[in-house]
């Protein structure tokens, strides 16, 4: 009995020392940013940037942007936001999606592009961490040659380690409700991260992270469901004919991804499908198709962001360490990466069993990860419905449709939305604020 008591006391002391150590030594740097090049005047919110080292020798330096809630940071939730890719910078979220800044869409004239405030930032209702991950994305870098390339499951562990160290330094947020969010390819990483945090709360880590749930937009979840939904989606959106759709169904048997080379009929009709859809904007089918970043094209803002993020005055203001990376790119698709999660459905199941809330939303004009695939894998969970399919409204207008399930999962569409939420920022912001407050959409 006595030895057990002594062991318990020693263990508690070690955990306390470990927590203090994390808070004092494991954050590589953190700086409050009062102003940014390209933005006129002081920033109307509190921005912090910094690096946190993860790994045995803290060889991986993850860069982050932290923005306090513009409402009540002492009590509002804390949301970690992960961009997709894998390899896309968190500037995608900060400047194009749900952050408080955006690129001013002027034609580039050789001077520094301008930034403007946004009206529908999710920081109106929560504090947010925008994280550059995996290593090589955005401004994150490695101090040494990595023995193992990043992976889906490995990123979940690194993100968990990042959060432990970040909260060790920002203990005033340790009791705030915590959520993980993301879109696109992060549909593979976010559910695994939630499970990793949950596991850590039970097994190893003190203090526990106050994890409440997660939010995902147009998430890649299961290659079979998501890829095979593209052809039914194209038919429903009048991108292909009835005859071609029926021929595809008959010859491919519903599997358009793993077609046997000898199934020449199926391959022939898939080629016809591609001819019909190759010049469609994948991100939102009603937008112009653009092969280059021209001023009249939506992706022109990506070019402006590259000019902005590669400017030396911007890097100095953000406290980017010199000579850690070369040219900043919005999405570094060439990162060596191990795609070791083929389906995140089991993670969704485990997270629901553990009682975590989830909001899964889809822009209904996204061709990259169509809402049909998302609906299909959600149905495969066999959750009972507690609030059946209905429109959700903003100012007496239909903003989308929603359904709520017994396991605290809410699915919603955003009418007219695309692959990411910047196409419908007001609708997305109102949807998020209602959900995060526990209100029905």
From Swiss-Prot:
Function of the molecule: Probable carboxypeptidase.
Q: Which GO terms describe its biological process?
A: proteolysis
Disulfide linkages recorded for this protein, renumbered to the chain, are 88-331, 252-266, 290-297
Question: Mind naming one GO cellular-component term on file for this protein?
Answer: extracellular region
Q: What is the top-level taxon of the source organism?
A: Eukaryota
Under Enzyme Commission nomenclature, its number is 3.4.16.-
Which cellular compartments is it found in? Answer: Secreted
**Enzyme's top EC category:** hydrolase
Q: Please tell me in which tissues this protein is expressed.
A: Expressed in roots.
Name of the protein in question = Serine carboxypeptidase-like 3
Sorted keywords for this record are: Carboxypeptidase, Disulfide bond, Glycoprotein, Hydrolase, Protease, Secreted, Signal
GO MF term set: serine-type carboxypeptidase activity
Q: What is its main location?
A: secreted
The UniProt similarity line reads: Belongs to the peptidase S10 family.
SUPFAM superfamilies listed in its UniProt record:
alpha/beta-Hydrolases
Residues with an annotated glycan are 109, 350, 382
| Active site positions, chain numbering | 184, 366, 419
Which first-to-last residue range defines the signal peptide? 1-30
Q: Which gene encodes it?
A: SCPL3
